[in-house]
Amino acid sequence: MSYSNLKLFALSSNKELAKKVSQTIGIPLGQSTVRQFSDGEIQVNIEESIRGHHVFILQSTSSPVNDNLMEILIMVDALKRASAESVSVVMPYYGYARQDRKARSREPITSKLVANMLEVAGVDRLLTVDLHAAQIQGFFDIPVDHLMGAPLIADYFDRQGLVGDDVVVVSPDHGGVTRARKLAQCLKTPIAIIDKRRSVTKMNTSEVMNIIGNIKGKKCILIDDMIDTAGTICHAADALAEAGATAVYASCTHPVLSGPALDNIQNSAIEKLIVLDTIYLPEERLIDKIEQISIAELIGEAIIRIHEKRPLSPLFEMNKLK
């Protein structure tokens, strides 16, 4: 199939991943510039014709979250006004996903607001990875393709020999049990759960309470969709080590790693943290304990399948490793 009417553009948040995707699918990145006026307003210029093209924009809404989100909205508007046939947003990390419901009175549902903004701007399709809450897909009236990073993480641990009954996959909270179970199925391991109680007065903090499952004398693999300040994952790792785990590894799809995250990880019982490159990490943030693997091949294959109108279901395989 001809790719002459397929365009891939990168905005500011993760140009390194966009370059890898471009190389994977053999399509050069589109020419565009993003700049800010002196008052902080964002201006986007598309420097080539995209009339009649199927355009993909790659941008994670990581820090600075609001600027990166506005870049997407402005770019979509520019593409629509330039007569793109369709506009698909590839958002490896979907920011504001933690605000997916009203947990208390008078709270917003910001992940739904972001969905509304993308649709109003003119987005025809969203391609994303490991949403914080899978039901966010239902906030959209356009197609949402929801990829999973667990097979890539499973492949890494399989190559390290961390499989079988001597290994336990651990969810750091009850909400991540489904994710942990999928990874455990890949690695043929049992699972355990950390029972925690999150503080209602302090943001981004939690208290580990109990371990459900047998981890004594086992190597443990913690898995989460995202790590922000790393408080939860580090407390969980320390609790596992104190309970008799022989080694503790951690993994996540989205390395937000804000605030004291790097110090927390460095000073924790975690031996190695495996993350995907949905969020760009500069070299100075890749400390010895962190290893990053690329999701570019998976995203590239998804883009080609969408363009060729082929099913994405083979990309969701969780029962076998590469």
UniProtKB/Swiss-Prot annotation:
Q: For this UniProt record, give its keywords in alphabetical order, as a comma-separated list.
A: ATP-binding, Cytoplasm, Kinase, Magnesium, Metal-binding, Nucleotide biosynthesis, Nucleotide-binding, Transferase
Task: Read off the NCBIfam families from this record.
Answer: PRK01259.1, PRK02269.1, ribP_PPkin
Origin species: Streptococcus agalactiae serotype V (strain ATCC BAA-611 / 2603 V/R)
Q: Which reaction does it catalyse?
A: D-ribose 5-phosphate + ATP = 5-phospho-alpha-D-ribose 1-diphosphate + AMP + H(+)
Which residues make up the binding site for ATP? D39, G40, E41, R98, Q99
Annotated binding of D-ribose 5-phosphate, by residue: R198, D224, D228, T229, A230, G231, T232
**How the protein assembles, per its UniProt entry?**
Homohexamer.
Q: What is its main location?
A: cytoplasm
Does the keyword section mention Transferase?
yes
* Residues at the catalytic site: K196
Q: What is its EC number?
A: 2.7.6.1
The biological pathway it contributes to is: Metabolic intermediate biosynthesis; 5-phospho-alpha-D-ribose 1-diphosphate biosynthesis; 5-phospho-alpha-D-ribose 1-diphosphate from D-ribose 5-phosphate (route I): step 1/1
This protein's GO cellular component annotations are: cytoplasm; ribose phosphate diphosphokinase complex
Which PANTHER family does the UniProt entry name for this protein? Answer: RIBOSE-PHOSPHATE DIPHOSPHOKINASE FAMILY MEMBER, RIBOSE-PHOSPHATE PYROPHOSPHOKINASE 1, CHLOROPLASTIC
> What is the protein's name according to its record?
Ribose-phosphate pyrophosphokinase 1
Kindly give the HAMAP family that the UniProt entry links to this protein. Answer: RibP_PPkinase_B
UniProt cross-references to InterPro entries, sorted A to Z: PRib_PP_synth_CS, Pribosyltran_N, PRibTrfase_dom, PRTase-like, Rib-P_diPkinase, Rib-P_diPkinase_bac
- Binding, Mg(2+) 2: D173
Free-text function comment from the UniProt entry: Involved in the biosynthesis of the central metabolite phospho-alpha-D-ribosyl-1-pyrophosphate (PRPP) via the transfer of pyrophosphoryl group from ATP to 1-hydroxyl of ribose-5-phosphate (Rib-5-P).
Q: Name one GO biological process term.
A: 5-phosphoribose 1-diphosphate biosynthetic process
In this chain, Mg(2+) 1 is annotated as bound at H132
Cofactor binding mode and count = Binds 2 Mg(2+) ions per subunit.
Where, subcellularly, is it found? Cytoplasm
Q: Which GO terms describe its molecular function?
A: ATP binding; kinase activity; magnesium ion binding; ribose phosphate diphosphokinase activity
